[in-house]
Design a protein with these regions (language model features):
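Conserved inter-motif catalytic segment of the P-loop NTP-binding fold
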Residues: 65-161, 168, 251-254, 264-267, ...
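The Walker A/P-loop phosphate-binding site
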Residues: 1-94
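Phosphate-binding/switch region of NTP-binding enzymes
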Residues: 34-35, 40, 45, 71-73, ...
Length: 277
């Protein structure tokens, strides 16, 4: 630990590239972003699309990105399903990158345990050794969160242990994390109206909301007419200096490629001119 004067602090340089990984403060190096939503809201496909965008340094739904080495760690779906989805998306979008790494471990990996931390550390070290460009930032995608905990997802001790271990990895290996997670069950008030608490709809302890730098929410908007369109919103952007409006995305089932079909217009603000890509 070092104690800096004002001059020393202003002269300090981080041990990693300081470029924003996703612009507008959405994802900065050494931070944690969560993408959450209910079952069937295309979260995993969103994470695959995001992984390809970062690995290629191409825009993610119109937001510029910095090229990164991306390690997608999927513990819910069988390897064959991930292979089929990734292949279909890659063919449909004509996208490929040597900066992408995937793992679907056969055994459970719990990051609220010492053994789980050690195992993921080994995996990250292997990815860094095999990276085509060691200068690129490393982004680790964990999907889904609840399977990375041996304890209960609402238990304060277990949640803090998970967060401490992830923080240790961030600091020691200069890692940026993206975590895929579920929303809690929908609640209604006495009049039958749905109660929506924004980022507080994350399943589990409020310690998640407090810890995360960015929270991206995906909500299915056409469950009875195609089940293929979601609304994406930024429920928390700790490091953004501007308000980020949401947008609607249609997922094309024939190739698993997404398309922005509408952007939210904020009253009293100028409409966004960001490309619909």
């Amino acid at each position: 630990m070092t104690i800096d004067t004002l001059h020393q602090l202003r002269q300090w340089e981080p041990p990693y590239r300081p470029d924003a990984i996703i612009e507008e403060g959405i994802l900065l190096p050494n931070t944690v972003m969560m993408l959450f939503g209910a079952a069937g809201s295309w979260k995993t496909m969103n994470s695959i699309h995001l992984a390809f965008c970062l690995a290629k340094g191409e825009p993610w739904f119109g937001f510029k990105t910095t090229q990164a080495t991306v390690f997608t760690h999927q513990v819910e779906l069988p390897k064959l399903i991930i292979k089929d989805r990734v292949s279909k998306y890659s063919n449909g979008s004509r996208a490929a990158s040597q900066n992408l790494f995937f793992e679907t471990p056969e055994d459970d990996l719990h990051l609220d345990t010492t053994f789980g931390l050690q195992q993921l550390t080994k995996d990250i070290e292997e990815v860094k050794r095999r990276a085509t460009n060691p200068a690129l930032p490393v982004v680790v995608i964990l999907d889904p969160l609840y399977l990375y905990l041996a304890g209960h997802i609402s238990d304060e001790y277990e949640v803090k242990k998970f967060q401490q271990n992830v923080n240790q990895l961030r600091k020691k290996h200069n890692i940026t994390f993206i975590i895929i997670h579920h929303s809690r069950l929908r609640r209604v008030d006495s009049s039958g109206q749905v109660v929506d608490l924004g980022a507080e709809e994350i399943m589990g302890s409020s310690y998640w909301n407090n810890w995360l730098d960015t929270i991206v929410r995906v909500q299915l908007v056409n469950p009875f007419t195609g089940n293929d369109t979601v609304h994406v919103s930024f429920d928390k952007t700790r490091n953004s200096q501007t308000f980020l409006p949401g947008f609607k995305v249609k997922w094309h089932r024939e190739n698993l490629v997404p398309e922005i079909i509408e952007r939210d217009i904020i009253a009293e603000d100028e409409p966004s001119v960001r490309d619909l890509t």
